[in-house]
Amino acid sequence: MTTIGLKRIYEAPSPNDGYRVLVDRVWPRGMTKEKADIDLWAKDIAPTDNLRKWFCHDPAKWNDFQIKYREELEGNKPALEDLIATAKARGGRLTLLYGAKDEEHNQAVVLHEFMQTL
């Protein structure tokens, strides 16, 4: 079984993070690759540029964003299943990393919920 967690990329890495995957399409501001200490930058599972720009972290668009992003994720299940399998092979812990300040209204929250159903 794989445990999936969420964490802002600006928080210090921990050995308990397991397989650390950045799920933003754009690299987080001010973050160096060394400091990020990620195992994978999964741009392909992040929201498309059009969806990301439309949402613009506006909580008023949150419900519609969730629906639209889940539709994108439906077409990307093989990549998500590969992530879970890799995390399982590396000890069973996957941490989805994101750069957004809003910890409740961001793509990683939607992705986390979606991956729980796989």
Show the residue positions of the predicted features.
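Residues lining hydrophobic/aromatic ligand-binding pockets adjacent to catalytic sites
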Residues: 1-118
